[in-house]
UniProtKB/Swiss-Prot annotation:
One of its GO terms (cellular component) is cytosolic large ribosomal subunit. HAMAP family: Ribosomal_bL28. Belongs to the bacterial ribosomal protein bL28 family. GO terms for biological process: translation. Residues 1-20 are annotated as: Disordered. Signal peptide: none annotated. The keyword Ribosomal protein applies. This is Large ribosomal subunit protein bL28. It holds the Pfam family Ribosomal_L28. The keyword Ribosomal protein applies.
Length: 78
């Protein structure tokens, strides 16, 4: 399973670890992903999504029904 938020599309980005001696080694910054069950009142069921913390805030702000409609429009499975 890929490390990508289903709502925002955020994925890993790359950068450097930098030591005290300024040595640089490549690393990945991973998004803060969580599996979360959201109750969908209109469908009378839970929907399980893999979302970032920002994705949860988007769902809180816009509503789960609006977000699910967008996910369905782009063919996302959930």
């Amino acid at each position: 399973m890929s490390r990508v938020c289903q709502v925002t599309g955020k994925g890993p980005v790359t950068g450097n670890n930098i030591s005290h001696a300024n040595n640089k080694t490549r690393r990945r910054f991973l998004p803060n992903l969580q599996h979360h069950r959201f109750w969908v009142e209109s469908e009378n069921r839970f929907v399980r999504l893999r979302v970032s913390a920002k994705g949860m805030r988007v769902i809180d702000k816009r509503g789960i029904d609006v977000v699910l409609a967008e996910l369905r429009a782009r063919g996302e499975k959930f």
